[in-house]
UniProtKB/Swiss-Prot annotation:
Coiled-coil ranges (or none): none
Annotated CDD domains: ACD_sHsps-like
Domain of life: Bacteria
PANTHER family: HEAT-SHOCK PROTEIN 20 FAMILY MEMBER
Family: Belongs to the small heat shock protein (HSP20) family.
InterPro entries for the chain: A-crystallin/Hsp20_dom (IPR002068), HSP20-like_chaperone (IPR008978), Small_HSP (IPR031107)
Residue ranges constituting the sHSP domain according to the UniProt record: 21-131
Protein name: 18 kDa antigen 2
Role noted for this protein: Not known. This protein is one of the major immune reactive proteins in mycobacteria.
Record lineage: Bacteria, Bacillati, Actinomycetota, Actinomycetes, Mycobacteriales
């Protein structure tokens, strides 16, 4: 005997997508954290070819685009839960980040961006000048 969990609403949603050809927007999960003088962002993109990735920054908006190709139409799918086609995600970057020095690496289905904090935004010590005044003997 095999036990199966069923969710009738999920099944109905999947059936509607198959019949009507509608899909929810593809999800591009990410994690982001600060590591010293830089921010690190990782996007999960399993099954995406590195050549289909596109990154651009315009006015402090970082856009990540990716494409996961459609499956062979001759297949009769039993389950198709991974998003297909072109999808994107935008991040709004603060003025305190140096968008000219963003580094991107893609390995094992994870896109990792390293975004340094701008020099002008880093904490710095300000020297205080003090002038010694001599009193005038009156």
């Amino acid at each position: 005997m095999v036990l199966m969990r069923t969710d009738p609403f999920r099944d109905l949603d999947r059936w509607t997508q198959q019949v009507l050809g509608t899909r929810r927007p593809a999800v591009m999960p990410m994690d982001a954290w600060r590591d010293g003088d830089q921010f690190v962002v990782e996007f999960d993109l399993p099954g995406v070819n590195a050549d289909s990735l596109d990154l651009d920054v315009e006015r402090n908006v970082l856009t990540v685009r990716a494409e996961r190709p459609d499956l062979d139409q001759n297949r009769e799918m039993v389950s198709a839960e991974r998003p297909r086609g072109v999808f994107s995600r935008q991040l709004f970057l603060g003025d305190n980040l140096d968008t000219d020095k963003i580094e991107a690496n893609y390995h094992d289905g994870v896109l990792r961006l390293t975004i340094p904090v701008a020099e002008k935004a880093k904490p710095r010590r300000i020297e205080i000048n003090h002038n010694h005044r001599t009193a005038i003997n009156a």
